[in-house]
Amino acid sequence: MKKLTAALCAVLLVFCMFVPGAAAAGPALGATRAYCIIDADTGLVLAQQNMDEELHPASITKVMTLGLACEKAQGDWDDVKLTVSHEDVYSLAGTDSSHIALREGEEVPLVDALYATQMASANDGANLLAEYFGGGTIADGVAAMNAQVEELGLAHTHFSNPHGISDEDHYTSCYDMAQILRWALQQPGFEDVFTRNQMYTCLLYTSPSPRDLS
């Protein structure tokens, strides 16, 4: 019951974020353009408004990115390190997007990439994870994301990147993202990553001292 309640609250809060200003006002459903609350166990829709409207998900995209990374890792994060590619860093040039200043050629522990992507909304971290679960390039990771969308039978979602930077071909609906979150919560380690609100990590390539990702 505790897990179910937490999942439902997470879904509600996620979809209130679709509306500018919603964070300041709180989750007032009457003022929310679109939302979808589901039963995390069954997928049954409990309440909704415009749940199939296609919207730009922004960083909510990272729910899928983190879910696929956790699925591949299967809870075995120890000693897994990822090498930062040129594309991870320089594909974000000029976007003024959130990042953790990864550097090409650096080795990053998988666990740090996961938490940085979730807690700092790091787009370079999301790129790194996409290469990890895609087995090659960022594009391979995006293809895996869209393959998962198809496997889940979702009709109103398409991803063009793993982080959520605006693109005409990058969209989802409240219903689809609720189902993506439901699936992601079933992946080993995802719930811990998704609900963590503070972590210290030592990223030596940006700072010699522990960095607070909260």
Descriptions of predicted regions:
Residues 24-175, 184-188:
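Active-site-adjacent loops and short helices of periplasmic peptidoglycan-processing enzymes
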Residues 15-22:
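C-terminal segment of classical bacterial N-terminal signal peptides
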Residues 7-13:
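Sec-dependent N-terminal signal peptides
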Residues 83, 189-203:
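Acidic/histidine-enriched alpha-helical segments
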